[in-house]
Swiss-Prot record:
Transmembrane parts of this sequence: none
Bias kind Basic and acidic residues: ranges: 150-165
Compositional bias of kind Low complexity: 316-327
Skewed-composition ranges (Pro residues): 240-255
Protein name: Zinc finger X-linked protein ZXDB
One annotated GO molecular function: C2H2 zinc finger domain binding
Location of region: Required for interaction with ZXDC: 340-646
Keywords: Activator, Metal-binding, Methylation, Nucleus, Repeat, Transcription, Transcription regulation, Zinc, Zinc-finger
Main location class: nucleus
Stretches the record annotates as Disordered: 1-23, 48-120, 138-184, 240-259, 301-330
């Protein structure tokens, strides 16, 4: 082993007589004053240990240097602050430091001291130069072999010829006090060379004391007896050296340096403290303070992972000493605190206990795959950094939940205390989620969100009274609709319209439903410029809220402020506050989601724009809807224009669903293709298929194929007929027609149809009894009379306009082909008193003259009315 340098006792003031100390030293250790003036003695101190065997190559050199027989070792220069008051060449070399192959020199007069050691050639050479605790010269000798006999003390009565000795205390040293005598207990006296004061002093100076020092992290027992220093390995350390802070910050210790802590360390006996003080420093004159407890050899400092900045010199010793497993020997943040620094780069964490540092180091090794604790169960590959985590993991295999919640009524248990603590926070923060609307509190955010939906949705004051049903509704009409589900077993009112199988629990509801088939909308909005009409009064009242700006349904969310006229609109708006998007685009490959149905509708139009070209247009003249397929157009006509399936089949067979490329304009819609045979049926008398389908009349869609007109329609068209100058589009009052039959012509010309004038028409009588009986097929529609007019398009109308000059009692129909759509005329009059279903409303009616006799006689004509309902409103 190697002891490079022996530091003097801390606290020796600079410039004091005798041995000095480095700057910032501690207390001064001095020998008894009564022994300082005696004749110098020679003590041979042997350092004994397990590594002291073998011949020391530097033993002779050290002995010669100590005795002054050889030259001084220049490389063992004394410390700059060491001074020796004794004479001789030995005093000049006292207090020197040892090197790899150096020796040591002794000081005279107890003023200097040093040690040295080295190794060369594989053999160890150790020697120790100690200041004489009782004064006089101290001689160092290298050990030669293990177990060598302890050399006896050599005492001389006078000074040696090689050195100058002083009979009294050196100049500048104060007289020592008597209280240091108790620090060195008396023991068996050493054998003296002769009687006299020197022998008595030697006997009094003999002392035996023991202590413990740590060299290279190994505790050694130090025993100083009869001038012999002995180091042995203890079987078991009886105590751990204490750590006390220094009175002031110190620089980092040098590698291998001996550190002398404060003498007032707890747990050290006074004798051991005195022995350590005597072994650590030379005896000096003056007062004797408390002695250090032991001598600690600091390890060579390793490079610190996070070196302290220069201004933090107070923390540098602790950071450097924390690299060792023992921890820092210097002061920490507070008195008696040991800090262990993590050696990993860029970590810098410190710990108060060594095992905490070990556990922390496992976290660094775990990132490199070093997890030593593995689950022993087969099939489980979990590994952990600590045994506690493995133990906690094994509880999960055993289904053990030892940590139960202490809250009454909870009953939950957990596998770890950490999970229990996390659960307890829920009880501590119970009802911490508060609703901003009603101030009600909830334990979790999920429950709060569920509660907030009740505020976003409108109130539902109407509850079902059926037994066992607790559903609530926003409006009373929704409640009535729901109640019908409970009365389905009762007698229901079924819709008799072909293709409709809806049933209702009340006749009034069926009546409202039938209006959707007939197109009747008796409830008209009376606001100027509106023109909307509805099938029920409730829908009309709901519509009037727009004109009155009655937005009774307001969003309850703070800061929103939106209001709506209908409850369902508010309900759809409330979804936007929930953050959900329930409306998904049905187009394949499109994952767009929306919170409102209206947003989805707007989005769906973007997909329709990708279609190359529109194929079909709605055949209703006032409807400009375009469709990509006939199926979508048929669906539109059924729902929007209330056309039956039979009528749609006829239109499809007549090829009336015309592509838009053939529709030049709404006013020139070519709806030809339907034969008269398919459009007119049940003609009495002559077998001519000329009875108009009433469904086509009611719908306002009339198509006539010019090429299919091959039947002889009796009638004549005089070339000089003055009625050609008039059109059928002029309105007339039917009451006036009924009151003045003489205004009506007695012959019905071919002004029912327009076309080329043909001479030589054959006349046939017209049986008006069939017309009065309800067969209005032949005159179900009135045509333009002027043949010079361009073809006109179908126009929606709910009134019939009758031109009195165009109505003639002619019973013959022309055989020429017609090439135009027939437009119903408009007329306004009150309905018959017996018509109670439609009420007072404007309806499509057709007026026909009803001659009671033959066409040749001048008789009064009666006007019959046929009620029709157009779907285009």
């Amino acid at each position: 082993m190697e002891i490079p340098r022996l530091l003097p006792a801390r606290g020796t003031p600079q410039g004091a007589g005798g041995g000095g100390c480095p700057a910032g030293g501690g207390g001064v250790h001095r020998a008894p004053a009564s022994l300082a003036c005696q004749a110098p003695t020679r003590r041979l101190l042997l350092l004994r240990g397990a590594q002291d065997g073998g011949p020391g190559p530097r033993s002779a050199e050290a002995q010669r240097a100590s005795r002054g027989l050889g030259p001084s070792l220049n490389r063992l220069a004394p410390r700059p602050d060491h001074r020796s008051s004794g004479g001789g060449r030995g005093g000049g070399a006292g207090g020197g430091g040892g090197g790899s192959g150096g020796g040591g020199g002794g000081g005279g007069g107890g003023g200097g001291g040093g040690g040295g050691g080295g190794s060369r050639g594989g053999s160890d050479d150790f020697f120790l130069l100690l200041l004489d605790p009782v004064g006089g010269d101290v001689e160092t000798v290298g050990t030669e072999q293990a177990g060598a006999p302890v050399r006896r003390e050599e005492a001389g009565a006078g000074p040696r010829p090689e050195r100058r000795q002083s009979a009294g205390p050196p100049a500048g040293r104060p007289e020592p006090g008597p209280r240091c005598l108790s620090a060195v207990p008396a023991a068996s006296p050493l054998p003296a060379a002769g009687p006299g004061p020197a022998a008595a002093a030697a006997a009094a100076a003999a002392a035996a004391f023991a202590g413990t020092i740590t060299i290279h992290n190994q505790d050694l027992l130090l025993r100083f007896e009869n001038g012999v220093l002995t180091l042995t390995t203890p079987p078991l350390p009886a105590w751990e050296p204490g750590v006390a802070p220094f009175p002031q910050p110190q620089p980092p210790p040098q590698p291998g340096a001996l550190i002398a802590p404060q003498a007032a360390a707890a747990g050290f006996p006074p004798a051991a403290a005195a022995a350590a003080a005597a072994a650590a420093a030379g005896a000096q004159l003056g007062d004797c303070p408390e002695l250090p407890p032991d001598l600690l050899l600091a390890e060579p400092a390793e490079p610190a992972a996070c070196p302290a900045p220069p201004e933090e010199e107070a923390e540098a010793p602790a950071a450097a000493a924390a690299q060792s497993p023992r921890g820092p020997a210097g002061p920490g943040p507070g008195p008696g605190v040991v800090l262990y620094l993590c050696p990993e780069a860029q970590c810098g964490q410190t710990f108060a206990k060594k095992h905490q540092l070990k556990v922390h180091l496992l976290t660094h090794s775990s990132s490199q795959g070093q997890r030593p604790f593995k689950c022993p169960l087969s099939g489980c590959g979990w590994t952990f950094t600590t045994s506690y985590k493995l133990k906690r993991h094994l509880q999960s295999h055993d289904k053990l939940r030892p940590f139960g919640c202490p809250v009454q009524g909870c009953g939950k248990s957990f596998t770890t205390v950490y999970n229990l603590k996390a659960h307890m926070k829920g009880h501590e923060q119970e009802n911490s989620f508060k609703c901003e609307v009603c101030e009600e509190s909830f334990p979790t955010q999920a429950k709060l969100s569920t509660h907030q939906r009740s505020h976003f949705e409108p109130e539902r004051p109407y509850q079902c009274a059926f037994s066992g049903c607790k559903k609530t509704f926003i409006t009373v009409s929704a409640l009535f609709s729901h109640n019908r589900a409970h009365f389905r077993e009762q007698e229901l009112f079924a819709c008799s319209f072909p293709g409709c199988s809806k049933q209702y629990d009340k006749a009034c509801r069926l009546k409202i439903h039938l209006r959707s088939h007939t197109g009747e909308r008796p409830f008209l909005c009376d606001f100027d410029g509106c023109g909307w009409n509805f099938t029920s009064m409730s829908k009309l009242l709901r519509h009037k809220r727009k004109h009155e700006d009655d937005r009774r349904f307001t969003c309850p969310v703070e800061g929103c402020g939106k209001s709506f006229t209908r409850a369902e609109h508010l309900k759809g708006h409330s979804i936007t506050h929930l953050g959900t998007k329930p409306f998904v685009c049905p187009v394949e490959g499109c994952c767009a989601r929306f919170s409102a149905r209206s947003s989805l509708y707007i989005h769906s139009k973007k997909h329709l724009q990708d279609v190359g070209a529109w194929k079909s247009r709605c055949p209703v003249p006032t409807c400009n809807k375009l469709f990509t397929s006939k199926h979508s157009m048929k669906t539109h006509m059924t729902k929007r224009h209330n056309l039956s399936q039979d009528l749609l089949a006829q239109l499809e067979a007549a090829n009336s669903l015309t592509p838009s490329s053939e529709l030049t304009s709404p006013g020139q819609s070519d709806l030809s293709g339907a034969e008269l045979v398919s459009l007119f049926s049940d003609v009495p008398g002559h077998g001519s298929a000329a009875v108009l389908d009433t469904a086509l009349v009611n719908s306002g869609i009339l198509t006539i194929d010019v090429a299919s007109v091959n039947s002889s329609l009796a009638g004549s068209l005089p070339a000089d007929n003055n009625s050609n100058n008039h059109s059928l589009g002029q309105a007339a009052e039917p009451r006036a027609l009924r009151g003045a039959p003489s205004d009506l012509p007695q012959s019905l010309d071919t002004s029912l149809f327009f076309g080329t004038s043909v001479a030589g028409y054959q006349h046939s009588p017209l049986d008006m009894d069939d017309v009065s009986a309800g067969n209005v097929g032949l005159f179900g529609s009135l045509a333009l009379k002027n043949s010079s007019l361009e073809p006109q398009a179908l126009t929606p109308s709910n009134k019939l306009t009758v031109d009195t000059e165009a109505l003639t009692p002619s019973s013959t129909l022309c055989e020429n082909s017609v090439s135009e759509l027939l437009t119903p005329a408009k007329a306004e009059w009150n309905v018959h008193p017996e018509s109670d279903f439609f009420g007072h409303e404007e309806e499509t009616q057709f007026g026909f003259s009803h001659p009671t006799g033959s066409h040749g006689s001048q008789k009064d004509t009666d006007l019959i009315t046929v009620t029709g309902t157009p779907f285009l409103v």
